[in-house]
Amino acid sequence: MKILIAEDDFVSRKILNTQLTPLGKVDCAANGNEAFIAVKMAFEENQPYDLICLDIMMPEVDGIMALKKIRQLEAQKGLSTETRSKIIMITALSDKNHVMAAAQANCDGFLVKPIEKKRLFDEIRKHGFDIPE
C-alpha cells in the first residue's frame, strides 16, 4: 500500500507515520500544497497513492482545498470512485461545518484527534484495505 500523510504538526505526523509504516510505503507532507504536489508526482510516476490522510488545518493550502484539488486531478485522470485514492480527513476540529465541507469535497472518512491506532485501522479497513488487527 502506498500512503501519504499530510499533517503540519510534527508530532502528529510522526505518530501517524509510525502507525502506518507497517502497512506500506509512507510519504509525508507538511501542508496541503506539498500534499497536492506529492499526489501529482505519484500520478506522473504511475504509482498513485492508495491512502491519503489529510489534516484539515494546515498552512498555505488547508486540507479541504487539497482534497478538492486532488479529487479534481483524479477526475481529470478518469478515475472512478472505486479506483481513486481513499482520503481520510484527520483533524482536531469536530464541528459540523468541517465535517460537511470534507464530505462535500468527497472525502472517504473522517477521524478526530487524538488518533488511536485501532480507530485509524478500523477506518482504513472500512475502505476495503486488508490490514492486520
Describe the residue ranges of each PLM region:
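Conserved acidic segment of CheY-like receiver
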Residues: M1-F10, L16-L20, I52
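Helix N-cap/capping motif at the beta->alpha junctions
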Residues: D8-F10, T21, C28-M41, G63
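Active-site beta3 strand of CheY-like receiver
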Residues: F43-C53
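Active-site T/S-Asp motif of two-component receiver
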Residues: I52-D55, A66
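Alpha4 helix (beta4-alpha4-beta5 surface) of REC/receiver domains from two-component response regulators
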Residues: M65, K77, E82-T83, S94-G109, ...
